[in-house]
Design a protein with these regions (language model features):
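A ligand-binding cleft/hinge motif common to bilobed small-molecule-binding domains
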Residues: 87, 104-112, 158, 182-214
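Bilobed "Venus flytrap"/periplasmic-binding protein-like clamshell domains
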Residues: 41-46, 57-73, 105, 125-178, ...
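Acidic, polar ligand-binding/catalytic clefts
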Residues: 68, 72, 77-141, 207
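Periplasmic-binding protein-like
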Residues: 43, 121-131, 193, 197-238, ...
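Short helix-initiation/N-cap motifs at beta->coil->alpha
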Residues: 80-91, 135, 154, 169-179, ...
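Extracytoplasmic small-molecule ligand-binding "clamshell" domains
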Residues: 25-104
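Ligand-binding clefts/hinges and TM-proximal coupling segments of bilobed small-molecule sensing domains
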Residues: 25-26, 154-171, 208-209, 238-263
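Extended ligand-binding regions for polar small-molecule ligands
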Residues: 61-73, 138, 152-153, 219-258
Length: 263
């Protein structure tokens, strides 16, 4: 005959067993309301820890790999929601079109979504066109100088705040700016140093300036009000940083030489 203590213990175990699926269902309802984990990504040949690329079979990138693994842990399929840049992802945050994303964080975006752990810290600078006489920030920040940035991004806002005389113009895609820089129609392009170093290899005569005007931090994010989802993605990224999953995602996407930088 069971003792009262054993009866109480058995009751608690049974209650926990019943409650756990309910908690899991509640999380899935919030983080994957369509039955799929909709991962917002931005497409660009720039690569790096934020951008994804289009491939013959689908998409590749650090957010692509992390989204696939997150969906597997939740037990749901993954669906990639494609955007041209992080500004478009931000604009869609309140429209219910995506569930999770990885993108650069700044105070303006914190009013539109909730951020989890930072997994990348990048140095933002400028690349100047072939044949340019610009050698540093002082010679760049002059009247008549045309600087491009990807529209409505953290880097664009940083460049506008940094440059007092040069004119900063936003464009929708990396590809468009690449063409303008190559043809000499713009004087400079603001982006993270690692991506600009790759661009410099593709456009002979360009030069990446030595100085840094902004530290850009990239983190996982969910829409406002999704507290259960935020708790889940926070644990996911904390685990991914310590168990090698994030390192593997970097290595699989041509970032073997890039360190994982957190706050």
């Amino acid at each position: 005959m069971p003792t009262p203590f054993r009866s109480v213990l058995a009751g608690l175990v049974l209650a926990a067993a019943v409650a756990m699926p309910a908690l899991a269902d509640g999380l899935k309802d919030e983080i994957a309301p369509t039955g799929k984990l909709r991962v917002a990504i931005a497409i660009s040949p720039a690569g790096g820890a934020f951008w994804s690329t289009k491939t013959e079979t689908g998409y590749a990138g650090v957010p692509v790999d992390l989204g696939k693994e997150m969906a597997a842990q939740l037990g749901v399929p993954v669906e990639y929601i494609v955007h041209q840049n992080s500004g478009q992802i931000t604009d869609a945050a309140g429209k219910g079109t995506w569930d999770v994303t990885w993108l650069p964080k700044d105070p303006e975006r914190e009013t539109k979504m909730m951020f989890g752990p930072i997994y990348e810290v990048a140095d933002a600078t400028y690349i100047v066109k072939p044949g340019s006489n610009v050698t540093n920030f002082a010679t760049l920040d002059q009247p008549g100088i045309k600087v491009a940035a990807v529209n409505a991004t953290t880097t664009m806002r940083g460049a506008i705040a940094h440059l007092k005389n040069a004119k900063v113009t936003g464009y929708q895609t990396y590809d468009e700016i690449f063409g303008l820089l190559k043809s000499g129609e713009i004087d400079a392009f603001a982006l993270s140093r690692d991506q600009l170093n790759k661009m410099a290899q593709q456009i002979p005569g360009t030069r990446v300036l030595d100085e840094t005007f902004k530290k850009t931090v990239t983190a996982v994010a969910v829409p406002l009000g999704h507290s259960q989802a935020l708790a889940f993605v926070t644990k996911f990224m904390t685990d991914a940083t310590t168990n090698g999953m994030l390192r593997k995602a970097y290595d699989n996407n041509s970032l073997k030489d890039s360190p994982i930088r957190t706050e």
